[in-house]
Amino acid sequence: MLIENVEYDVLLERFKKILRQGGLKYTKQREVLLKTLYHSDTHYTPESLYMEIKQAEPDLNVGIATVYRTLNLLEEAEMVTSISFGSAGKKYELANKPHHDHMICKNCGKIIEFENPIIERQQALIAKEHGFKLTGHLMQLYGVCGDCNNQKAKVKI
C-alpha cells in the first residue's frame, strides 16, 4: 500500500493498527522512532537511527534490538522502504514521500534523491512498447559522488 504524503496522525494510527494486528504493544520508543523517520529526509541505518533517537531523547530507554525489529515491521507493512548495501546492511526511509529515485555513492554510501520527468516518461513508453502494465519501479544508480570525486582529484595533485 502506497502512503505518499500522509499526515503524521494518519500514519501513527496505521502503525498502531499494524501493531495490534501483530499482537504487539504500542510503546513510546516505537512512536519516537516513527516520528523521527517522519520528520527527517535522512536515509538511516538502524544504528544511525538509534543514535539520533538517543541524542534527541536521552531519557528514553530504547534498545538497538527495538529499532531493528520496528524497522523490519514497518518495512513488511510497506511503511518504510530500504536500500540494501549487501553485507554493510540497509538504509531506511519513510515511504510517505512522493516517488523519487536514488543515486548511491559506492565510496561513502551517500544517497542523493532525484526525480526526472523525462526518465519517468521514457519508462512508461518502454513499458507500453512491450505491452507491460507498469505499476511502479525502483531505480538506483550507483557511482561516485561529487565529494568523493573531488577528494580523489586532490590526492592526485
Swiss-Prot record:
- Report the superkingdom from the record: Bacteria
Q: Which parts of the sequence bind Fe cation?
A: 99, 101, 120, 137
Matching entries from Gene3D superfamilies are given as: 3.30.1490.190, Winged helix-like DNA-binding domain superfamily/Winged helix DNA-binding domain
Q: Where is this region: Dimerization?
A: 97-157
Q: Where is this region: DNA-binding?
A: 1-96
Picking any one GO biological process from the record gives: negative regulation of DNA-templated transcription
What are the record keywords, sorted?
Cytoplasm, DNA-binding, Iron, Metal-binding, Repressor, Transcription, Transcription regulation, Zinc
In its keyword annotation, does this UniProt entry include Iron? yes
Q: GO cellular-component terms in the record?
A: cytosol
Please name the CDD domains in this protein's record.
Fur_like
Residue stretches in coiled coil = none
Predominant place of localization:
cytoplasm
MF GO annotations: DNA-binding transcription factor activity; identical protein binding; transcription cis-regulatory region binding; zinc ion binding
Cell compartments where the protein resides: Cytoplasm
Binding of Zn(2+) occurs at: 43, 93, 102, 105, 108, 113
Write out the similarity annotation: Belongs to the Fur family.
PANTHER family (alphabetical): FERRIC UPTAKE REGULATION PROTEIN (PTHR33202:SF2), ZINC UPTAKE REGULATION PROTEIN (PTHR33202)
Subunit and interaction comment:
Homodimer.
Q: What does this protein do?
A: Acts as a global negative controlling element, employing Fe(2+) as a cofactor to bind the operator of the repressed genes.
* Protein name stated in the entry: Ferric uptake regulation protein
- Organism of origin: Campylobacter jejuni subsp. jejuni serotype O:2 (strain ATCC 700819 / NCTC 11168)
Q: Recall the taxonomic lineage recorded for the source organism.
A: Bacteria, Pseudomonadati, Campylobacterota, Epsilonproteobacteria, Campylobacterales
- Point out the gene that encodes the protein: fur
